[in-house]
């Protein structure tokens, strides 16, 4: 039975209570307050829903992740990076990145990054949890992504691209930055061909929970202004 969250409580049900079909649906309801979102990521779940649906919280099994040392850079992407085809910054325009990620896609009917979701993550950015990666081509924002950094873990949320390999360029740059800063895992949530091409793979929900327990409260050395 699906658990409905109460607005006056930040408690989530145990991860093993998540449904098998649909895979990983853990709870519904609650709100998108910054405190609840922080608790959700610490617990091992994330919000994902469409306009008109209640807030849905997920913890899929298996979980798609990328270990920084396993980043795969294709020949074409490596060529672009060696040429420094784009300029990459961090936290220079979080609002623009999340708006671009929320924009309609040709292959989708709508967006799960609702206005309420955008406002929630902008607040997390103000609090220092959410960060953006911007990819620039001569002053034009052509790609980027955003997510949360907590301890030695980074929780990726969404990315966009308006130019050849721009989102992969930004993601690869981020992974290199995180590796140097002592991060051990990047949560990619759900599997996609795009992420698998970069080296992402599946681990069990329990293994993911073990990483949370060991690394959420460990220090990292990341700087986010460049």
Swiss-Prot record:
GO terms for cellular component: cytoplasm. Its main location: cytoplasm. It is found in: Cytoplasm. It comes from the Bacteria. The keyword Transferase applies. InterPro entries: Acyl_CoA_acyltransferase (IPR016181), Leu/Phe-tRNA_Trfase (IPR004616), Leu/Phe-tRNA_Trfase_C (IPR042203), Leu/Phe-tRNA_Trfase_N (IPR042221). One of its GO terms (molecular function) is leucyl-tRNA--protein transferase activity. SUPFAM superfamilies: Acyl-CoA N-acyltransferases (Nat). Its EC number is 2.3.2.6. Keywords: Acyltransferase, Cytoplasm, Transferase. One of its GO terms (biological process) is protein catabolic process. It catalyses: N-terminal L-lysyl-[protein] + L-leucyl-tRNA(Leu) = N-terminal L-leucyl-L-lysyl-[protein] + tRNA(Leu) + H(+); N-terminal L-arginyl-[protein] + L-leucyl-tRNA(Leu) = N-terminal L-leucyl-L-arginyl-[protein] + tRNA(Leu) + H(+); L-phenylalanyl-tRNA(Phe) + an N-terminal L-alpha-aminoacyl-[protein] = an N-terminal L-phenylalanyl-L-alpha-aminoacyl-[protein] + tRNA(Phe). It is an enzyme of class 2 (transferase). It holds the Pfam family Leu_Phe_trans. Belongs to the L/F-transferase family. HAMAP family: Leu_Phe_trans. Functions in the N-end rule pathway of protein degradation where it conjugates Leu, Phe and, less efficiently, Met from aminoacyl-tRNAs to the N-termini of proteins containing an N-terminal arginine or lysine. This is Leucyl/phenylalanyl-tRNA--protein transferase. The gene is aat.
């Amino acid at each position: 039975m699906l658990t409905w969250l109460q607005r006056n409580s930040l408690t989530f049900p145990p991860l093993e209570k998540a449904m098998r079909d649909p895979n990983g649906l853990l709870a519904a309801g609650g709100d998108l307050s910054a405190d609840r979102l922080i608790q959700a990521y610490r617990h091992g779940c994330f919000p994902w829903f469409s306009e008109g649906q209640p807030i849905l919280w997920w913890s899929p099994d298996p979980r798609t992740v990328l270990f920084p040392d396993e980043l795969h850079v294709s020949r074409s992407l490596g060529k672009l990076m060696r040429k420094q085809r784009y300029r990459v910054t961090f936290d220079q325009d979080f609002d623009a990145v999340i708006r671009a990620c929320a924009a309609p896609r040709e292959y989708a009917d709508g967006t799960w990054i609702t206005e309420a979701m955008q406002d929630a993550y902008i607040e997390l950015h103000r609090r220092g949890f959410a960060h953006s990666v911007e990819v620039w081509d001569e002053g034009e924002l052509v790609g980027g992504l955003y997510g949360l950094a907590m301890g030695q873990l980074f929780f990726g949320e969404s990315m966009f691209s308006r130019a050849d390999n721009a989102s992969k360029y930004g993601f690869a740059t981020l992974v290199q930055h995180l590796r140097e800063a002592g991060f051990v895992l990047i949560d990619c949530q759900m599997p996609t061909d795009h992420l698998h091409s970069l080296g992402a793979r599946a681990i069990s929900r329990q293994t993911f929970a073990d990483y949370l327990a060991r690394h959420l409260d460990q220090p990292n050395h990341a700087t986010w202004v460049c």
